[in-house]
A protein has these predicted regions:
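Small-residue-rich hydrophobic transmembrane alpha-helices
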Residues: 54-114, 151-170, 275-339, 372-386, ...
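Helix-terminus/linker motif at the lipid-water interface of multi-pass membrane proteins
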Residues: 32, 36-55, 124-131, 187-192, ...
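Residue-level signal for short hydrophobic patches within transmembrane helices
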Residues: 13, 17-36, 40, 63, ...
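Short runs within selected transmembrane alpha-helices of multi-pass transporters and secretion channels
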Residues: 75, 143-162, 170-181, 197-212, ...
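Residue-level hotspots within the lipid-embedded alpha helices of multi-pass solute transporters
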Residues: 31-35, 69, 109, 113, ...
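Short alpha-helical transmembrane segments in multi-pass integral membrane proteins
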Residues: 1-24, 82-147, 183, 189-245, ...
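Transmembrane helical elements of multi-pass membrane transporters/channels
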Residues: 22-41, 143, 154, 177, ...
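Alpha-helical transmembrane segments of multipass membrane proteins
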Residues: 39-42, 114, 156-160, 182-187, ...
Length: 455
């Protein structure tokens, strides 16, 4: 059955550059909103509760990324078959994938919440979290992990909407929740400490998720379900898991390297932790364009592979890489001029060591933003093409890079070595991803040609 595409966005026809920019810009704004209220959390903690509290929240960043990133990867992976069925015009299979994906995501989020809430304090101790910030770190991350089902709700619904070409609606709902998050931060941080900022985050994201769900149910007329769509079918479950689990593992394996690196940073003391936290928040904000381009290419590649248009996939990679490279040069110039002033958002001017170290990390990382562009664009493209296992291997490359720095360089070169950990990880990932993409493209072209000859 052909899909009526007027309610959604078809990325298989038209100028790739215009389509990528048109799709990525709303997605970018949504990510900026998300990072903005994450930054506001950190700014409020640093200014209202002090450098120790800032370090406490920051020390949870890598384990947060590992667990929450795994959940986000699962959700994004579940949306790839939806994009492919949309590109192929198969409405029945599309609805089956959405229904089965929703059931799996619900079961997964509940299980994950129970497990990580039980073990999160032990994990923080294993990571050698400094004793003077351990209680604050636990108070923050426990609440964040309690909110995993709400986070999965938002990411699952927004990923489905993006797979159908709508990157604007999730942005609107995220903007609303961002404002609410800031208000709740200001209300809850003084009486509840760092836990208050965590409650503000999960409440805001939960509201955003429910808004996405209600809107999707009302506006996406192609999503008309039957009871069969909600029953788990072996074929759809296997395909969803083949996409979702590798994509989740990609985030988690990458994050394992970050956890190992964070453990090394923790060994340098709470001042180093605070420096990495401030620089990390700024860097995450600056990296949103790369994430937006990557997520765009996952949907773009998924739809065009479904439509058997490999030339458009290659053109999309080139366009996204050029866009990301131009941005890399611009943001490096901005941070060279004003990185110290921006760091003052997180700590007082008297914290000169933290300010100097944050600037050092920002500048070293941003010199290598062009390799980071390729990591995001090529990895998400490969995922959208259906080769999620290659994304796992790219994550392994990043994990190895960060682990080598943590184990062998940080003990000798201290904080400076920490600053080079991510660039090493990005370069190793690129050395694997570029040949992997060429292999995937060649494989699909051969498959499409073979199928065409048999018809």
């Amino acid at each position: 059955m052909a899909i009526k595409k007027s309610a959604v966005k078809d990325l298989t026809n038209g100028s790739p550059v215009k389509l990528i920019l048109g799709f990525a810009l709303p997605l970018l704004l949504g990510m900026l909103f998300q990072q903005f209220y994450s930054m506001v959390d950190t700014i409020i903690v640093g200014k209202f509760l002090g450098a120790k509290a800032l370090a406490a929240v920051g020390s949870t960043g890598s384990i947060n990324f590992m667990i929450v990133g795994f959940c986000m990867g699962i959700c994004n992976g579940f949306a790839i078959p939806v994009a492919q069925m949309f590109g192929a015009g198969d409405k029945k299979a599309l609805c089956r994938y959405v229904g089965n994906g929703a059931v799996l995501a619900g079961l997964f989020s509940i299980t994950m919440t129970v497990l990580v809430c039980i073990w999160c304090r032990d994990i923080l101790i294993l990571m050698k979290t400094p004793s003077d910030i351990l209680d604050g770190a636990y108070a923050y991350i426990f609440v964040i992990f309690l909110g995993i089902p709400l986070m999965v709700l938002y990411n699952q619904t927004s990923a489905i909407m993006r797979s159908l070409g709508d990157s604007r609606s999730p942005l609107i709902f995220l903007g609303i929740s961002s404002v609410l998050n800031i208000v709740l931060d200001l209300v809850l941080v003084r009486p509840m400490g760092v836990a208050g900022t965590a409650w503000a985050t999960i409440i805001a994201q939960g509201i955003s998720g429910f808004l996405c769900l209600f809107y999707m149910k009302k506006k996406f007329t192609i999503l008309t379900f039957t009871r069969e769509d909600w029953k788990l079918h072996k074929h759809y479950v296997i395909n969803l898991c083949n996409m979702g689990i590798p994509m989740g593992l990609q985030y988690s394996i990458t994050a394992i390297g970050s956890v190992i690196l964070q453990t090394a940073v923790n060994g340098l003391g709470s001042t180093a932790v605070a420096s990495v936290t401030a620089a990390g928040k700024i860097s995450m904000f600056c990296c949103c364009p790369f994430d937006a381009l990557g997520s765009t290419m996952a949907t773009y590649a998924g739809q065009n592979v479904g439509a058997k248009k490999m030339d458009r996939v290659h053109t999309g990679i080139l366009a996204s890489s050029i866009i990301g490279s131009v941005y890399s040069v611009v943001i490096l110039g901005v941070m060279f001029l004003w990185s110290r002033e921006i760091s003052l958002l997180f700590v007082d001017a008297s914290e000169t060591v933290i300010l100097d170290q944050a600037r050092q990390m920002l500048l070293i990382n941003m010199v290598f933003y062009i390799p980071l562009t390729l990591v995001n664009v090529v990895r998400f493209t490969v995922q959208g093409m259906g080769f999620s296992k290659f994304a796992i291997l790219a994550g392994v490359c990043e994990m190895i890079g960060r682990s080598v720095v943590a184990f062998f360089l940080v003990p000798y070169f201290g904080y400076t070595a920490v600053c080079f950990a991510s660039p090493v990880a990005w370069i190793l990932a690129d050395l694997f991803l570029v040949p992997a993409y060429l292999y995937c493209a060649k494989t699909l072209r051969s498959l499409f040609e073979k199928n065409a000859q048999m018809m």
